[in-house]
Amino acid sequence: MENQPKLNSSKEVIAFLAERFPQCFSAEGEARPLKIGIFQDLVERVEGEMNLSKTQLRSALRLYTSSWRYLYGVKPGATRVDLDGNPCGELDEQHVEHARKQLEEAKARVQAQRAEQQAKKREAAAAAGEKEDAPRRERKPRPAPRRKETTPRTPRAEKPAAKAPRAPREEQHTPVSDISALTVGQSLKVKAGNNAMDATVLEVTKDGVRVQLNSGMSLIVRAEHLVF
């Protein structure tokens, strides 16, 4: 027992469980919904194997059941299974709806992160372009040799220097200081990098504000990312 290798991460624990209970867990592809109370079954069957502790098993289960492929498998008509793959009852509507919302929120977070990364890339590219387009220092022209003239020449009027175009005024936004003052249906904006996306308030929760973007996607946003 002392010579058993130790599993250091939740992913390694999941891989071990998929090998130990292939009819219940899977390392890839769509996952099957697990029996309610399966944690206690795991403790009784594998605690001590591979030096596994209850904390490691609990963390691995949490990671497994919050993964996209597991949430995809929680759908109407699906059946829960125990460690040996035996059916343990059909999923109820409440659990299916909860999984759908979790998956939707996870996708929204990924999309918001990608939008923020794209905004930063565009900002960096624009800054690099401005440096390349900066005008080089003009050389002063050499004065032309004077010619002897019998009549005085009238000096040409110098053209006024062209005014540099004004930089576009950056749109100003007011931060949302108190989310409890927000109302359902109120319009505001969600900050993503230097951009602000139009959104509508759907719900005010303890974790933040659920909003809907113009694209139809809904997500929960913290107060510091909301502006008017």
From Swiss-Prot:
Cited InterPro entries: ProQ, ProQ/FinO, ProQ/FinO_sf, ProQ_C
Any GO BP annotation: post-transcriptional regulation of gene expression
Biased composition (Basic and acidic residues): 117-136, 146-173
Assigned keywords, A-Z: Chaperone, Cytoplasm, RNA-binding
Major site of localization recorded for this protein: cytoplasm
Cellular component, GO, one term: cytosol
Span list, region Disordered: 105-178
Cell location: Cytoplasm
GO molecular function, one term: RNA strand annealing activity
NCBIfam families: PRK04950.1
Family label: Belongs to the ProQ family.
Purpose of the protein: RNA chaperone with significant RNA binding, RNA strand exchange and RNA duplexing activities. May regulate ProP activity through an RNA-based, post-transcriptional mechanism.
Designated name of the protein: RNA chaperone ProQ
Naturally occurring in which organism (per UniProt): Citrobacter koseri (strain ATCC BAA-895 / CDC 4225-83 / SGSC4696)
